[in-house]
């Protein structure tokens, strides 16, 4: 029998038989991991198994490559805290869906896990989460091998007046170097460089990360389209202007 115990974030839940569910969790040491929770539809467990929840997970299986089973205990819920905030709820749904879409099963991403927990906690608290979400998408691209290089201009090598990102290379481009290519470049708002986090700037940043999610990451994952939850979040955010 193989067994481990660790805290994790609940990414998704789906029915399995009449009384059980299959949960997908993201943990620090074991990555994105699936398992059966017996009795998961019960009055005791159903309220605990809400996407975004922080859980104490114990996983057991006879063999390493088996799906195995989870027993779960609540650490802290987050769904109730965002239910009354459509924007935060859509952001949480987007982050959970992107994690499911992108992360390799059973591969550890310890630093990115910590950043995910911090983002979800910020969403539940309702403070400072908008730039944190943009940072999270940038970190996701980096983890997947498509990180943006914003350290200096790809054309001139300078690190001043950076205003655009090359849609091909993901490298920054200065305003002066953009020239006739300016209409083909992606925006590089100040927030992506550690500047003020205005709504317009965050939306511009998400336009840029969205390009790489759709045109770089998705093709690498078998040309599956990015999750609709992200498009819904961008729509809700755009209407919040």
UniProtKB/Swiss-Prot annotation:
One Pfam family cited in the UniProt record for this chain: RecO_N
Alphabetized InterPro entries for the sequence: ARFGAP/RecO (IPR037278), DNA_rep/recomb_RecO_N (IPR022572), NA-bd_OB-fold (IPR012340), RecO (IPR003717), RecO_C (IPR042242)
Biological-process GO terms, alphabetical: DNA recombination; double-strand break repair
A GO CC annotation given for this chain: bacterial nucleoid
Gene3D superfamilies, A to Z: Nucleic acid-binding proteins (2.40.50.140), Recombination protein O, C-terminal domain (1.20.1440.120)
UniProt keyword annotations, A-Z: DNA damage, DNA recombination, DNA repair
NCBIfam families named in the record: reco
Function, as annotated: Involved in DNA repair and RecF pathway recombination.
PANTHER family linked: DNA REPAIR PROTEIN RECO
Listed HAMAP family: RecO
Family: Belongs to the RecO family.
Protein name per the record: DNA repair protein RecO
Species this chain originates from: Dinoroseobacter shibae (strain DSM 16493 / NCIMB 14021 / DFL 12)
């Amino acid at each position: 029998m193989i067994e481990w115990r660790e805290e994790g974030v609940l990414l998704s839940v789906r029915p399995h038989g009449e009384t059980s569910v299959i949960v997908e969790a993201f943990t620090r040491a074991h990555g994105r991991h699936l398992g059966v929770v017996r009795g998961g539809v019960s009055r005791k467990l159903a309220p605990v198994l809400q996407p975004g929840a922080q859980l104490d997970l114990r996983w057991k299986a006879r063999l390493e490559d088996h799906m195995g089973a989870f027993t779960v205990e609540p650490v802290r819920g987050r769904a109730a805290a965002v239910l009354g905030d459509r924007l935060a709820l859509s952001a949480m749904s987007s982050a959970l869906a992107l994690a499911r879409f992108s992360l390799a099963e059973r591969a550890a991403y310890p630093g990115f896990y910590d950043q995910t927990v911090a983002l979800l906690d910020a969403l539940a608290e309702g403070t400072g989460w908008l730039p944190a979400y943009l940072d999270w998408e940038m970190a996701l691209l980096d983890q997947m091998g498509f990180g943006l290089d914003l350290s200096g201009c790809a054309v001139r090598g300078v690190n001043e007046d950076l205003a655009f990102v090359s849609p091909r290379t993901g490298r920054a481009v200065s305003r002066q170097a953009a020239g006739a290519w300016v209409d083909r470049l992606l925006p590089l708002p100040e927030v992506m460089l550690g500047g003020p986090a205005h709504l317009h700037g965050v939306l511009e940043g998400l336009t840029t990360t969205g390009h790489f999610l759709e045109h770089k990451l998705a093709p690498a994952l078998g040309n599956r389209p990015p999750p609709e939850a992200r498009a819904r979040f961008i729509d809700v955010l755009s209407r919040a202007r």
